[in-house]
Amino acid sequence: MSSGQQPPRRVTNVGSLLLTPQENESLFSFLGKKCVTMSSAVVQLYAADRNCMWSKKCSGVACLVKDNPQRSYFLRIFDIKDGKLLWEQELYNNFVYNSPRGYFHTFAGDTCQVALNFANEEEAKKFRKAVTDLLGRRQRKSEKRRDAPNGPNLPMATVDIKNPEITTNRFYSSQVNNISHTKEKKKGKAKKKRLTKADIGTPSNFQHIGHVGWDPNTGFDLNNLDPELKNLFDMCGISEAQLKDRETSKVIYDFIEKTGGVEAVKNELRRQAPPPPPPSRGGPPPPPPPPHSSGPPPPPARGRGAPPPPPSRAPTAAPPPPPPSRPGVVVPPPPPNRMYPPPPPALPSSAPSGPPPPPPLSMAGSTAPPPPPPPPPPPGPPPPPGLPSDGDHQVPASSGNKAALLDQIREGAQLKKVEQNSRPVSCSGRDALLDQIRQGIQLKSVSDGQESTPPTPAPTSGIVGALMEVMQKRSKAIHSSDEDEDDDDEEDFQDDDEWED
């Protein structure tokens, strides 16, 4: 029955002659998803025990099932009343099916000798024909697989056997023999032939050309796989599981043979070797140098004068910043006491003014304004010193007003927050850079994509691209419809025996 199904290339369910159409439909529904029965018959199952006596095990409908999910063939017996699987036997390699009687067929099971006693000899005849046809196709396919690896290797082996030393010895021998006697010349040729046979008998890379490390049943031998082939498979994204898979490894092996063999693939791979990757770009540009690197650190506190009285609360201010840099301006040192809280910022004024005078040497008689306030970030450099304005927060010039200044500092609430837009414009390039650092939001962010170069994409042409295309077609066929699967699995069983997913 299976031979009649060759034109459509898809096996259809074949029911039993003794069952009604409704019973056959029920039987087909018990087979399972993507399972097809190639022949069905009503049988009794017998098994031979150790005492060599046949004993009946069960009765039901025997089916020669093509199990596409498991990619194998089984003999299964179903109970159509309860819809249960009663027994099964996989058609292993070298499976032998005997028919001592037309209605009584025997074979070796996994644990004992098994027999099928058919209720109808016509069904028995058709069932036997379906099984023997299947076993014959599998046998022919196995023979072709055994002969395939040895076929294309003969011319390749003769091409690879090249020994420049042999030609050198031949040329050298001819010169010597031209001088010697004719008999000595013949002896020299005989010795030369023995040397040539020894060299030819041990070619360097004949083994790799011979079998490629591939077996029809187990796939590629990963332990003895050629490193260049392994590199090719890695470039194409072929996993070890795919190399061990019987069907996928067969597709890969056929691709290598169609390309010209292992040496042709290796030569093409060397020719298409990608250029070295460009040097990786550096990360983001280094941040600007810290402000203190461009100027000297603040001088230590001097011992002149008495320090101002401490405030009533715990000091929380940061250490005084280094003085700002202005060309042509003498910068005053910071206040002597580091525990002294920062004075309030002075309001900017549009009137030009000279640089601030040096700090007072004593608590009395001082008329100079305080040093410039620090910026909001503690480690940042201070803005240029502001100029006093005519407002209420003008710094007093007398020593009597010094106490009022301290009271304002202690109150804290009257201190004005320094806004970004209220900073005076710096007059030098370095001050402008410091202002940008303090503002922060004006700095350009560096994207993470610039830190590392993207990986070099795999080549999509040549031998690598062709193999990748073959594997993509194979993957699409596995996950596509049954019709697509028939095309890719044609290598497993020819004619109508492709697997279906």
Swiss-Prot record:
**Residues modified as Phosphotyrosine:** Y253
Q: How does the record describe the protein's post-translational processing?
A: Phosphorylation at Ser-239, Tyr-253, Ser-480 and Ser-481 enhances actin polymerization activity.
Q: Where is the CRIB domain?
A: 200-213
Q: Does the keyword Phosphoprotein apply?
A: yes
Omega-N-methylarginine sites (modified residues): R304
Instruction: List the signal peptide residues.
Output: none
Composition-biased stretches (Acidic residues): 482-501
Biased composition regions of type Basic residues, renumbered to the chain: 183-195
Keywords in alphabetical order, please.
Acetylation, Actin-binding, Cell cycle, Cell division, Cytoplasm, Cytoskeleton, Methylation, Mitosis, Nucleus, Phosphoprotein, Repeat, Transcription, Transcription regulation
> Can you give the residue ranges of the WH1 domain?
31-138
Which GO BP terms, alphabetically?
actin cytoskeleton organization; actin filament polymerization; cell division; dendritic spine morphogenesis; membrane invagination; negative regulation of lymphocyte migration; negative regulation of membrane tubulation; plasma membrane tubulation
Known role = Regulates actin polymerization by stimulating the actin-nucleating activity of the Arp2/3 complex. Involved in various processes, such as mitosis and cytokinesis, via its role in the regulation of actin polymerization. Together with CDC42, involved in the extension and maintenance of the formation of thin, actin-rich surface projections called filopodia. In addition to its role in the cytoplasm, also plays a role in the nucleus by regulating gene transcription, probably by promoting nuclear actin polymerization.
Assembly and interactions? Binds actin and the Arp2/3 complex. Interacts with CDC42. Interacts with FCHSD1. Interacts with FCHSD2. Binds to SH3 domains of GRB2. Interacts with the C-terminal SH3 domain of DNMBP. Interacts with SNX9. Interacts with the WW domains of PRPF40A/FBP11. Interacts with PTK2/FAK1. Interacts with PACSIN1, PACSIN2 and PACSIN3. Interacts with NOSTRIN. Binds to TNK2. Interacts with SNX33. Interacts with NONO (via second RRM domain); the interaction is direct. Component of a multiprotein complex with NONO and SFPQ; associates with the complex via direct interaction with NONO.
The entry's protein name is Actin nucleation-promoting factor WASL
Supply the source organism for this entry: Rattus norvegicus
Tell me the lineage of the source organism: Eukaryota, Metazoa, Chordata, Craniata, Vertebrata
Q: Which gene encodes it?
A: Wasl
